[in-house]
Amino acid sequence: MSEVTDQHGAALRTTRELAQAISSVERGGPAADALIQTALTRLASERSQNAVVIGVTGPPGAGKSTLVGALAERARAADRRVAILAVDPSSVQSGGALLGDRVRVEERPGDEGRFVRSIATRGSGRSLSHTAAAASLLVEAAGFDLVFIETVGAGQADLGIVRLADLVLLVEGPEGGDEVQAMKAGLLESAHLVVVNKSDRPGADRAVERLRSGLALGHDAPEVLLASAVDGSGVAELLTALEGLAVTRSGGGLQRRIAAHLAAAVEARAAQRLRDAESDGRLAELAQSIAAGERPLSGAVDQLLKGS
C-alpha cells in the first residue's frame, strides 16, 4: 500500500490506518484537512494510472451489496487492489451510518489489498456526502486501483455519483417496475452500464428486454447485462465490461473526483452555517427583518453564506 503522511505524522500504510484517516475526515477539523491535502498532493504528482472509481446504484433489494462483493472477489483474485465505500443513510442523532459495513465481502484478515467501509450520507441531498468524496481520494492515494462506491438506492440523491465516479453501474432486479423509477430519477440516462442481477430468478430475461426496449430510443444507450451474485454467473463478464469501459473513459478521473470533493465541501460548509444560524437565532432574526421589509432576501442569503 502507498504511504501518505500528513503534517501530524499519520500514514496510510495499512487498511487500519486508512480507516482511521476516514474517521478523521468524518470528524472534520485541521487534521482532516491536512490528510486530504496531502493525499491530493501525492495524487497530483503520481505518474502512474489513477484508480478506476465505479459508482453502483439501483433500487433497494436489487442485490447491489452482494453483487459488489462478487465483483470485488473476482477483481481481487486478479490481484487488483479493491476498495468498497458503501454510502449509508445517516442517523439524525449521531450522524453515523445506520447500516454499518453491509457489503457482502468475505473477511480476509491480513489482506491489505481490500478495504471495506460504510460512509454516512449526513443529509447530503442531491450530492454524495462530503466524507464519501474525501474517502474516494484517500483510498486512491493509499494505492487502491479499483474503487466501488455503492449508493443508498435509486433516487434523486444518487445522481451525485455521476459527479464523482468514472463509471456508473445501475443494478436492477428481475421483478420489474424499478426501471420506471430509475428513468424518473434520471439514473438510466446517467448509467454507463446496466445489469439485471439475480438472473437465477424468474423474470430476469423479461427485465432485460424491458430495459433494452426502454433504452433503445436513447443516444449512446448503455449495454444491459445479466448476472447472478448468488451463483456467480455473468459476474466475470460484467467485470470485463466495466474494465473495458474504463479504458475508453480513461483520463480526467482525478480532476473529476477533486471537483466532486470541492462541491461536497462547499455544500457541507453552507449547510453547517445554516444550522449554526438556526441554533443561535440569527435565521429567525433575518426572517423577521425580511418580513418587516427591512432587508432584501438576497442580502440575507449572502449574510448566511458568509457566516455573519
Predicted regions and their residues:
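Hydrophobic positions on the alpha1 helix immediately C-terminal to the Walker A/P-loop
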Residues: 67
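Nucleotide-state-sensitive switch-loop elements of NTP-binding domains
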Residues: 2-54, 59-62, 71-157, 164-170, ...
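Conserved P-loop NTPase nucleotide-binding/switch module
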Residues: 139, 151-191, 196, 201-210, ...
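Acidic/polar active-site rim loop that often engages polyanionic ligands
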Residues: 111-114, 188-194, 221
